[in-house]
Amino acid sequence: MSSPIRNRLQLVVTLIFCLFFENVNGLNNFIDNFETLNYRATHVANQVTRRKRSIDSAASHYQEPIGFRFNAYNRTFHVQLHPIDDSLFHEDHMSDVDGGYADIKPSHFLYEGYLKDDPNSHVHGSVFDGVFEGHIQTGEGRRYSIDKAAKYFERDDRPTQYHSIIYRDDEINHRKWRVKRDAENLSEQMQGCGFSSRVRREMTDVQNSGESTDFFTNYMTMGGRSKRANTLRDHDGLYFVRTCSLYMQADHKLYEHIRMKEGNNDPIRTREEIVSLFYNHIKAVNEIYEGTNFNGIKGLHFVIQRTSIYTPDSCDRGRAKTDSDNPFCEENVDVSNFLNLNSQRNHSAFCLAYALTFRDFVGGTLGLAWVASPQFNTAGGICQVHQRYNEGSRGWVYRSLNTGIVTLVNYGNRVPARVSQLTLAHEIGHNFGSPHDFPAECQPGLPDGNFIMFASATSGDKPNNGKFSPCSVKNISAVLAVVLKSMPVDPTRNASPVGIGKRNCFQERTSAFCGNQIYEPGEECDCGFSQADCDQMGDKCCVPHEARGNGGPGPCKRKPGAQCSPSQGYCCNPDTCSLHGKNEEKICRQESECSNLQTCDGRNAQCPVSPPKHDGIPCQDSTKVCSSGQCNGSVCAMFGLEDCFLTEGKADELCFLACIKDGKCTSSVHLPEFSANRTNFLQNMRKDKPGLILHPGSPCNNYKGYCDIFRKCRSVDANGPLARLKNLLFNKRTIETLTQWAQDNWWVVGVGGLVFLVIMALFVKCCAVHTPSTNPNKPPALNIYQTLTRPGTLIRQHRQRHRAAAGSVPPGPGAQPRSGAASAPSRTTPSARPSAPPLVAPQVAVAVPPGVVGPPIPLIATHPGSSSSTPAVIVLEPPPPYTAADPGSAMGGPRRGHRKNKRQTSSDAAGSSGNGGKKKGK
């Protein structure tokens, strides 16, 4: 055998060997390269055991850090962990399993920390049986994932040499499953997200069919104001609320998979593993959204408010049992219908509601979500309430369009954690208003990779995989600008439909965020998100948020040698990064109505508490009194009375301060304590006038309105001309007045009704002549333009039409024709030609050319008593639209809306050919 042939055979054998053993060293189609971990976990387990024993003791509030080390990727990882502070879970977080309350304590098994030799690193995950599972991000930005081996092996096939694996994010292989996806020969390559063009059209139709309701009425009646309605705004008028509450659900498919894998067939362990799964996903999503500047909107944050876990015990043959509310029992559903199952529930109490599953959807789809829009008339996305939508043949149905779904399986393989986390961030991006990245400049590809909102799932190892493109930032910023301009509402209280308008359900953040220029617990300083923010603030002593992963002291840390930062308080010298001394008498707080001036004490960067003034001093234009240095005391309480609201009277009367005296709410104008000759509680511009008038912006009419700058009580919905017109026509007093007047003057109502009917009849009669008709016996419609410009022509044309109609009546039997009628046929000009000839014409002689055989003459019976034996002849002419006309005009063609290609019979075909011959001969 020659050498070239031998080399070719060796090459073929090598290729076959590589293809056959392609996945021998890989866990699945996603992970090819990994390293095993088998560190001793006894010391970790002891820490967890000691914690469980002391959960009821006071010492359980604080837990000593736990640590372990292992070697992988030619380095040593020395991990330091401590229990989470629950900042990722809402203060009212609740868990349920199959609808029943479940006592799950996330702080008992969830941990976060850092690498001991890398202070800028971050570690988060869970610890079960002394084994850690989670993610590590080094100070240089490299990411590692640690998974239990039980996730990839059956219970009887689990390895005994190691308990965990570790792999880098850049070792996630996407080439194989993309080949499989392309091999499906789909008409549309979904590539991870199910938001195809067909699905987009269907979802858009639903989003635009929402039922509108009265926003202002529901807003006030349902107590829509948030716990702190006086939340600050920025220079663009956007409220400083950045926390989005989440409702996380796991269906029975995901529960069953985790129970058979890392759950070890233990129900309690399984539900804790699912909560850990939720935690790791939202933790990764927060890192992405908190680190993104959406055109000035920074610090978006997500908290888990409720978790629901559904088990197979709640389903029976694809349906929920009678005592279960599991919405996901249906077995064989596609991705869009699975999203509909989640959307059928009422999720108005949450910013977003997501369902995680282990269903292998067609086309490799990993997720789907409703896309938000900045348009008020388009529903869907963040904060959308549960309301009715018109779905065509299905009629009106209730939907919650603040929903999305994510699956953890793709073509039979469990998706790596980093991929599913980016998928969740991608679908939430849809909820925030971003479609898929487009055009080409937002799809850069290699070497930096595509962005989060790319239609295909990404591995997460490229620099752009965890970032939003400029296109996505623009789209999300537009939606947030509309939502955050609305007053924040408490979604747990205001859960009723408030129309298609954008509801602001974001809440104030309870945990610290590095980059919001607010000094919070756990931070050394906070000068801003970027270095430009710090420069604008005049702080050169603090490290900004964007310095994460660049080495140095780390974000929100003081620079080396700095004693303090101006972000900590006014008592820090921005030039020297040191405290102002007490002898400098640096003023840090000016005197106010209820507190005295305060200077720095040289011990802290924050300004000391100002000495309060005496209680009872009038403040806020004498509508409040000082209490412990704050202007929040009650004026009525100074006289032993209680505060109340006036609810009856004119608008300018409702803005007076009122107190309850002798069991009645009385205006301060009529109280002797606030007479015109009083010596205290004097108001500006109201000297020698009785009563106290409320400050502009104060609530009035029992919180149904507010006092404007003219000190008049303005209703919340009385902000525009339409609202004023509605109040004028449909308020209770107007309706009662009109009803009483109609009862007293019933005869006027009757006469007016008759006059109205007569006017309408005349209107219809006059306008009927301008309405076209398909009846060939009726005259053509008149020109409305001539009637409007020359009203006199309407009467003349009306008379002419009657005369023409009288002259076209065929004579009765035996009637004599008019002189000359038989000698010559009448001629009419085209303009005066009627729309159709009479069906029966007088008997006239019809000249037939010699040699031409005319059409057969239809006969009719003669009139009884008629002496004429000649039968009458019916002269038939084709009715419109077949009336002879100029072929070049529109009248020569068929009527609009009718078929042109009418099927012909054999006789019709013969007639057509004959007619065609005649035309040709003309």
From Swiss-Prot:
SUPFAM superfamilies attached to this UniProt entry: Blood coagulation inhibitor (disintegrin), Metalloproteases ('zincins'), catalytic domain
Name of the featured protein: Disintegrin and metalloproteinase domain-containing protein 10 homolog
> Where found, per UniProt?
Cell membrane; Basolateral cell membrane; Cytoplasmic vesicle membrane
Show the segment(s) annotated as Disordered.
797-837, 864-922
Asked if the keyword Transmembrane helix belongs to this entry, the reply reads: yes
Q: Which residues lie on this side of the membrane: Extracellular?
A: 229-745
So where does this one cross the membrane?
746-766
Give the propeptide positions. Answer: 27-228
**Which co-factors does it depend on?**
Zn(2+)
Query: Organism, per UniProt?
Result: Caenorhabditis elegans
Subunit and partners: May interact with tetraspanin tsp-12; the interaction promotes sup-17 cell membrane localization.
